């Protein structure tokens, strides 16, 4: 869906005379979102995901299509994930990652991930949602089927965790408090 020629022309018309690659990229996203059509919103989602991938490649030296082993060790070696929290690498995780990777997220989900939940390095997010969700599952459940089940459910939007869990588990932070009010209709 979406007409790339139309996006390119509309982007070109909106750009100032001098623009950086990042300006062009953001303008393409804006053009897509201004269409207010799901097919263009999904193109914007791919562009937003590309920004996260570029951050990973630039700051961690690994992309989201590398083996999960390469991704995992880059996250540990660059201090993005906590070595004391993460279990020892298991080759089985390659199939887990390949299973969750094809899940396409909507634009708002990718933006929310990048803004609120992705771990940052030098002030920019350096995890795609899929990689971060694998880290959350592994950090919380270790090398178990529960880790995969949680990662998959998170990517598919079937489970929601409080922000401290989404932010902290991969870094070894299990002490952050999240507040919520739950009412059950009782008088206690």
Q: For the regions a protein language model found, what residue spans apply to each?
A:
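Extended catalytic cores of very large enzyme megasubunits
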Residues: 1-188
């Amino acid at each position: 869906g979406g007409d790339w020629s139309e996006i390119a022309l509309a982007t070109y018309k909106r750009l100032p005379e001098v623009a950086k690659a990042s300006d062009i990229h953001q303008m393409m996203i804006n053009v897509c979102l201004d269409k207010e059509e799901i097919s263009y919103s999904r193109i914007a989602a791919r562009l937003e995901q590309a920004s996260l991938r570029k951050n990973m490649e630039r700051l961690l030296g690994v992309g989201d299509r590398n083996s999960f082993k390469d991704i995992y060790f880059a996250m540990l070696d660059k201090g993005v994930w906590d070595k004391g929290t993460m279990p020892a690498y298991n080759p089985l995780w390659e199939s887990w990652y390949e299973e969750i990777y094809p899940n396409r997220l909507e634009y708002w989900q990718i933006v929310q991930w990048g803004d609120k939940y992705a771990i940052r390095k030098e002030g920019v997010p350096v995890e795609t949602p899929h990689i971060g969700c694998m880290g959350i599952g592994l950090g919380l459940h270790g090398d178990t089927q529960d880790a995969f089940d949680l990662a998959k459910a998170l990517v598919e939007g079937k489970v929601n965790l409080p922000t401290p869990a989404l932010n902290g588990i991969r870094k070894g932070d299990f002490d952050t408090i999240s507040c919520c009010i739950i009412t059950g209709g009782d008088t206690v």
